[in-house]
């Protein structure tokens, strides 16, 4: 009966149990009302006491057999039997006391039934040690309620026998009064008791045999152990004692409980969470705990609102407040950096945007270099279309920034003091400009019009190749793509950019330049160094050409003599500077000599006149032509001999700086001169061709350029 609470109500299944209860209670009531008072007078007053105790015992066992759980197994959940539902065999065999016992798969409850378990078709449940389904008690008889059913049968049989016997005794005492009410009622009760005694007594005897043999009604009816040995029997006495005296079996079904709603009154209200302490509940593998953290609600809300896939914050901007002279250029560098996003330029990692430049200079000059590199990064990344196209060719080579220091902003020179011996980009033309009073306006025009594409080429090639080649450091304009760089629109020049990547040999050479050998010689005049046209724009080249025309018209300075070995000298002195040598960017020209024996350190030679490397074009000067001669590539300068005044010991001391491998690179790297094949620039021209360089006479030197153009330079 406890199993049908959740199912549809069926009145038919309550008819047998209701009839049994009515007959039991009704007959006993009539017996106590009409028969027991006479028996107490004639026989003994203990008769009604006995019948009362027996009736109560019968009624108690009847109630227990009806309302008690017989031992129902709970059904498997849907997620528990997914794997076993369709692939399970019908039977499984287990061994109990050496006997094979089959377990059948229950498709309704979705598990293998244990031994002696069967599925009740009426209750629709699998019952442990299923005996039978009794309609008189409206319940299955199983392991948990079989004891009460068996006692009910025994007590009912005894009660029926007592009612029938004591009623017969009453009739015998009142045989003359058979028509009386008491005698008639006693005869009716005897008929009912006698009617139910036959089946009840037979059922009781059957179960006594089953208990003695250790079997169930289901096993006896189906004949499971009819021809064999019952593995579940323990002997007659043990079987009886197990049924009557053993402890009750556990209950597998939980008792249904209704959910209770508890209303919290004001003394039990939850306190508000304070800012100082927040309780966090943690659910991890079914374990609850409370973790107290000292965080404010505002901080927790911010943490929870942040997405897990949010981008990290940008890196902090550099603090330029402590550097003087940089605030004016901050807006320019920022605008140029933002304009690079829309251009098709080589990808550069963000970490290099504010990377300081490393050089071989002294420690005192590290801070100016780093600050200048921060601002000139955006300038050097501006690339015209021709540079972007030419960078795809395999012949593109990286070059360092070799622009003269005069191109830098004057504020840098005032704010940061550079070591003249450690700075490798100071040109000789700037020093001569200081001696001749070169105007600041022309410097500003050159700075605004000129450009240096090698700075960007070195940066772009760092992304492409990852390193700098030694020959490209020595010959920046040897690449055929250099002409395409100058043909494009010229961006603003970088402000004091210094290449942060220097090769080992270049660092060694600069170390030698920092500590040159000083030869105590007097000030002598020397030939001007060749002009580096590869780092200048078309406007500057045109200005230089105009300056050369002015030099031809002016008379030569007194005391200037031709010295063939001073063309490639890399060290000079300004008037009044004594013997303090200074390195210049034109010292790289000395490395271009085919023999590579020109020493890096030279005696101090004064320089007069306006410089060739910083000759600017005036306001009214005409625009330059489409082609400009590259005097730095003239064979007359590359074929000059070493200065005879330099001792042999100095050459031997500086000879290890250029190894035979470097000499081979120097020879092969200059197969082209001024963008022309080597055959056109040979030392011995064929008949009918003008010589590339003529001997110097009268302080005027003739130099032939591209296309047969001849230039006269006053020396």
Swiss-Prot record:
Post-translational modification: Phosphorylation regulates association with endocytic proteins and its subcellular localization. Phosphorylation by LYN during fatty acid uptake leads to inactivation of the activity. Autopalmitoylated. Palmitoylation of the C-terminal tail regulates stimulation-dependent plasma membrane motility.
Molecular function GO terms recorded: protein-cysteine S-palmitoyltransferase activity
Statement: the UniProt record of this protein carries the keyword Phosphoprotein: yes
UniProt protein name: Palmitoyltransferase ZDHHC5
Cystine connections: none
Chain positions with Phosphoserine modification: 247, 296, 299, 345, 380, 398, 406, 409, 415, 425, 429, 432, 529, 554, 621, 684, 694
EC number: 2.3.1.225
Gene: ZDHHC5
